[in-house]
């Protein structure tokens, strides 16, 4: 915004704004994604793109992979002339190293992918500092799927097949795993539940990434299976090798689901709960009682979007990404992707951990007012020596 010294009744100052890196960022590697959400994952890539040096606290369950990837990053940094220390990787099994990193006064932000317990522990620690810093934590989700009768009538078998694959993909170790299916009570939903159960039991179970995830999965599955009013409609019972997760599908009424908050919690693995709602009003009530989620999906047709508009609105209010006639497990890396959501899916629903917008987590805006042109950052100088796209007087230019 260029200055207007002759403006009446008051002169307008020359004000120019750009983004600057926050400073050193600590990234905690995810246990379920040794590559895409770990040492060289989206947090690291976006922080480096923002101009921030990165310290990775490697996950102990894949420290060897972390070391290999770290070596590649350091070689790339040297090859491209990046400053020494722009990236480092630390290994430890305990929590002390991570705690000290978050508390260090030169660290300015934290990226985390993992459990609600772990994310909130870091969030609390960061806010207890003399200078609190942001913690961008992605902490999981049950990713509700609303299936309307029309979807079952038109393509019930197709959706059962697709969701059997989605629920079991990667042994269910996706944070976008569809762990909750909501439908309206009736023969159609019963038929869908039966077909989904049959399809999921046809698939060969696969190994989970490490014993800790496997143990937590079985603990959560067994806990929910024993809750009041819950029926286990699919349970893989054949013999498997160590750490192989047996898929399971549960079914429960809408009333029982509403009355039991335990059923709203994530079970991380090849697992999903089908909720039989007495009508669309109860379905909407359930959505309004859910915590924040990464994704929500609608299976139906365009007429359903109008007929059940309030249901769709309730779902949208709870999620960072809402899908129509798809499965949520794929996350495209692009500028329009939102991988985040209202708490506790993430600590700040305004940001994403996937896509180019993830960079915005690691920067802060600075305005320069009435600054001499030659002393401005090149990105703000009149001549635009960098040739970048800029917003000038409300219009994009380059």
Residue ranges with predicted function:
Residues 1, 70-77, 81, 105, ...:
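Structural signal for hydrophobic packing residues in well-ordered secondary-structure cores
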Residues 2-164, 182-189:
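Rossmann-like NAD(P) dinucleotide-binding subdomain of oxidoreductase/dehydrogenase enzymes
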Residues 32, 61, 94-96, 107, ...:
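Short, glycine-/Ser/Thr-/acidic-enriched flexible segments
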Residues 101-106, 149-155, 221-222, 246-248, ...:
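Short, surface-exposed amphipathic charged segments that create phosphate/polyanion-binding patches used
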Residues 173-175:
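Extended low-complexity, polyampholyte segments enriched in Ser/Thr/Pro and acidic residues
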Residues 183-294:
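NAD(P)-dependent aldehyde/semialdehyde dehydrogenase
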Residues 240-243, 280, 285-376:
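C-terminal core of ALDH-fold dehydrogenases
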Residues 365-398:
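Structural signal for terminal/edge beta-strands and the immediately following C-terminal loop/tail
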């Amino acid at each position: 915004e260029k200055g207007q010294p002759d403006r009446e009744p008051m002169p307008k100052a020359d004000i120019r704004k750009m983004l600057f890196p926050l400073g050193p960022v600590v990234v905690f590697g995810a246990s379920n994604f040794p590559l895409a959400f770990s040492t060289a994952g989206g947090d690291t890539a976006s922080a480096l793109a923002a101009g921030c040096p990165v310290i990775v606290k490697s996950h102990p369950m894949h420290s060897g992979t972390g070391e290999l990837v770290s070596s590649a990053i350091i070689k790339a940094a040297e090859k491209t002339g990046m400053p020494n220390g722009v990236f480092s990787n630390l290994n430890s099994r305990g929590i002390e190293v991570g705690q000290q990193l978050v508390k260090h006064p030169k660290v300015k932000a934290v990226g985390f992918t993992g459990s609600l317990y772990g994310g909130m522990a870091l969030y609390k620690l960061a806010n207890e500092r003399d200078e609190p810093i942001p913690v961008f934590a992605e902490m999981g989700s049950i990713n509700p799927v609303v299936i309307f009768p029309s979807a079952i009538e038109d393509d019930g078998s197709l959706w059962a097949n697709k969701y059997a694959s989605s629920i079991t993909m990667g042994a269910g170790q996706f944070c976008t795993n569809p762990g909750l299916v909501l439908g309206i009570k009736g023969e159609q939903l019963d038929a869908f539940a039966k077909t989904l159960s049959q399809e999921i039991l046809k698939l060969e179970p696969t190994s989970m990434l490490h014993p800790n995830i496997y143990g937590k999965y079985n603990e959560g599955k067994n806990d929910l299976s024993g809750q009041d009013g819950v029926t286990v409609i699919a349970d893989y019972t054949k013999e498997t090798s160590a750490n192989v997760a047996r898929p399971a599908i549960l079914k429960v009424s809408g009333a029982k689901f509403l009355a039991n908050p335990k059923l709203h919690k994530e079970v991380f693995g090849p697992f999903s709960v089908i909720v039989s709602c007495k009508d669309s009003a109860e379905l909407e009530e359930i959505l309004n009682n859910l915590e924040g989620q990464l994704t929500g999906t609608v299976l139906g047709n365009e007429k359903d979007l109008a007929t059940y508009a309030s249901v769709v609105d309730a779902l949208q209010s709870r999620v960072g990404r809402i899908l129509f006639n798809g499965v949520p497990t794929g996350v495209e890396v692009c500028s329009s992707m939102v991988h985040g959501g209202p708490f506790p899916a993430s600590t700040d629903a305004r940001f994403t951990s996937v896509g180019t917008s993830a960079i915005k987590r690691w920067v802060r805006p600075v305005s320069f007012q009435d600054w001499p042109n030659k002393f401005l950052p090149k990105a703000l100088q009149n001549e635009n020596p960098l040739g970048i796209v800029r917003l000038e007087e409300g219009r994009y230019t380059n």
